[in-house]
Amino acid sequence: MNKPVAPNSYKTGPDEEGMFGIFGGRFVAETLMPLILELQQAYETAKNDPEFKAELNALSTFYAGRPSKLYYAEGLSKHLGGAKIYFKREDLNHTGSHKINNCLGQILLAKRMGKTRIIAETGAGQHGVASATVAARFGLPCIVYVGASDVERQKPNVFRMKLLGAEVKPVSAGNGTLKDAMNEALRDWVTNVEDTYYLIGTAAGPHPYPELVRDFQSVIGTEARQQILEQEGRLPDVIVAAVGGGSNAIGLFHPFLDDASVKIVGVEAGGRGLEGEEHCASMSAGRPGVLHGNRTYLLQNADGQILEGHSVSAGLDYPGVGPEHSWLKDSGRVDYVPILDNEALDAFQLCTRTEGIIPALESAHAIAQAVKMAPTMGKDKVMIVNLSGRGDKDVHTVGKLLGMDI
């Protein structure tokens, strides 16, 4: 979690102010600054504490089910007729996605800090479920803010959160999506700074959140790197992950950043196309600005107002991205590309039929990029795709879009 890096490494950020180049930082209300600094201090202490690491490792292994498998997607690979595609199976984790990795780390931090109330925001519902899960495990009350339109899209996950004892608060402001849920969670935090821990679900927000979320999620890439060396005897040629806020992607990417031979591709939500405003491709079509406490690429109009955006996937319709991704884009280390709704839907069905695995719509965006890339590569080439979550939560959405009455 805190190994030394070379000065010319891509792993040197963030600096003491939480900056990755010109991105990141701590743009928060004055009332929150002491809490942010307290969190930073608690995290610095925790990540150097062998007891903290041991407890997190034990929970990850025996509660979450790590390590997740690296699976050769033979059916999909043969169907496409190019590179060998491996799936990093984060869908097999407890709660069904990568979100549990971060939630376990942060709930242990909250405990260390003496916080007695957990708040979280969620889009696809997976982070809300994971937050409610760890809160239940440690006997803490949990409030989850969910955009009203996402409540409609993610009914099974809303029920799971309630079942786990969380209070679900729908947010109807704006378009009722992830951005609006995050706004409400920040308002709650400002009001209840004494006893409340804000368990952010993505690699965005004010420093130290982008760093600590990345560190807790880097277990994905650390495992995948070791697993591919064991299975193929070499590093992959390409790694691919979907990017909303960017936590599953930075978790896969970070351990590979200094491997120059590995091409890294982040996949954004292209929605209905980049020509209008019905997409969430902030790095393909946005520009730098400040949102939710950090400077990063954002979707905004000419006056700097944040646009709502659209994606078929509730977990990708965030109008910004984690600041480290913005820096990796500008530094040229990672390529970020958009995938359209219909391409993701096609990949969702193709993966299900060729592999017997129903992926989350977020993950389907990454698979859609693999569908484009793999046939252009030789059969001796190797690709890892992060299967960030399972698709049970999306079956109703997909059914509706395909004209099936569920």
UniProtKB/Swiss-Prot annotation:
Enzyme class at the top of the EC tree: lyase
Catalytic activity: (1S,2R)-1-C-(indol-3-yl)glycerol 3-phosphate + L-serine = D-glyceraldehyde 3-phosphate + L-tryptophan + H2O
Reported function: The beta subunit is responsible for the synthesis of L-tryptophan from indole and L-serine.
Residues forming coiled coils: none
Modified residues (N6-(pyridoxal phosphate)lysine): K99
Record Pfam families: PALP
Keyword Lyase: yes
EC number of the protein: 4.2.1.20
SUPFAM superfamilies for this protein: Tryptophan synthase beta subunit-like PLP-dependent enzymes
PROSITE patterns listed in its UniProt record: TRP_SYNTHASE_BETA
Obligatory cofactor(s): pyridoxal 5'-phosphate
Alphabetical list of NCBIfam families matching this protein: trpB
Highest taxon above the source species: Bacteria
Matching InterPro entries: Trp_synth_b_CS (IPR006653), Trp_synth_beta (IPR006654), Trp_synth_beta/beta-like (IPR023026), TrpB-like_PALP (IPR001926), TrpB-like_PALP_sf (IPR036052)
Protein name: Tryptophan synthase beta chain
Assembly and interaction partners: Tetramer of two alpha and two beta chains.
Protein family membership: Belongs to the TrpB family.
Pathway, per record: Amino-acid biosynthesis; L-tryptophan biosynthesis; L-tryptophan from chorismate: step 5/5
GO cellular component annotations of the record: cytoplasm
Record keywords: Amino-acid biosynthesis, Aromatic amino acid biosynthesis, Lyase, Pyridoxal phosphate, Tryptophan biosynthesis
Gene: trpB
